[in-house]
């Protein structure tokens, strides 16, 4: 059995020779789920739908879960026990240039125009109206 040296902290990956727990997270979930805390859940949801084609609807009693490709991003209201906190996320999309243009049209500020990176990504960076930073990338072979 795997035992964490820290109290109440589970292991997210098996160690060599250790037992692997198969039910430590719900089926279909990734190990890491980003969570953005904002004072404007509905506005951020609209932005994600417009720019990234994200799926999901604002929720009031639970975090809003937005699907983006094969990933989920949780969005929570920052007016309760948690203060609004921006995030920095790297998102792969079909076309970085078009997604960048949609972000700018939706009110985002350009930080970096689409640029070919030496590691094979075409990448752009924007800052949305809630101070989240989005690096938008499309992989192109080197």
Which role fits each region the language model picked out?
Residues 35, 77-78, 118, 125, ...:
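Short beta->alpha transition motifs characteristic of CBS
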Residues 47-48, 103, 128-131:
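Conserved active-site tyrosine of GNAT-family acetyltransferases
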Residues 60, 119-121:
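Short, small/polar residue-rich loop motifs at catalytic or cofactor-binding pockets
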Residues 50-57, 107-109:
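Conserved acetyl-CoA-binding loop of GNAT-fold acetyltransferases
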Residues 31-39, 64-67, 80-104, 122-127:
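Vicinal oxygen chelate
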